[in-house]
Amino acid sequence: MKLLIVAVGQRVPDWAQTACNDYAKRLPPELKLELKAVKTEPRAGKTLASLLAAERGRIEAAIPRGAQVVALDERGTRLTTLALAERLRGWQLVGDTVALLVGGPDGLDPALRQAAHERIRLSDLTLPHALVRVLLIEQLYRAWSLHAGHPYHRE
């Protein structure tokens, strides 16, 4: 199974990239992780709707046909770590690729959010985008570790 994170924004601080790489390499070979960063649309006098639509086009171009699409959204379903572990298990049964979408500074285009198979939130807090990437990959690793019986997660 492939976990594809499609994130708006190409600049990530070194500390965040290091953390993402660390958790990604801990995942087993059967859970391939790929991060595709797409360009943030420059504001330059554009409306919010046109900015989000441009980013939506880039995100959609990065999602393979047939992928299960999960949008990270502040209004999405609140999950516990155990619930995310169950979701991960379910995604593994559904198909080859799960695309997890991380919006830019203005979030995701409403049409993209609506078209997603599922919407989840990582936190009730507003988080910096670099931290969202780290947190998401860490939580995916933690979810895998629960089902694998790995001692990483403690109750």
Swiss-Prot record:
Source organism's superkingdom?
Answer: Bacteria
Q: Which reaction does it catalyse?
A: pseudouridine(1915) in 23S rRNA + S-adenosyl-L-methionine = N(3)-methylpseudouridine(1915) in 23S rRNA + S-adenosyl-L-homocysteine + H(+)
* GO molecular function terms noted in the UniProt entry: rRNA (pseudouridine-N3-)-methyltransferase activity
Q: Which CDD domains match?
A: RlmH-like (cd18081)
Binding positions for S-adenosyl-L-methionine per the UniProt entry: L72, G103, L122, S123, D124, L125, T126, L127
PANTHER family named among the record's database cross-references: METHYLTRANSFERASE (PTHR33603), RIBOSOMAL RNA LARGE SUBUNIT METHYLTRANSFERASE H (PTHR33603:SF1)
Oligomeric and partner information: Homodimer.
Q: What is this protein called?
A: Ribosomal RNA large subunit methyltransferase H
Taxonomic lineage per UniProt?
Bacteria, Pseudomonadati, Pseudomonadota, Betaproteobacteria, Burkholderiales
Q: Which gene encodes it?
A: rlmH
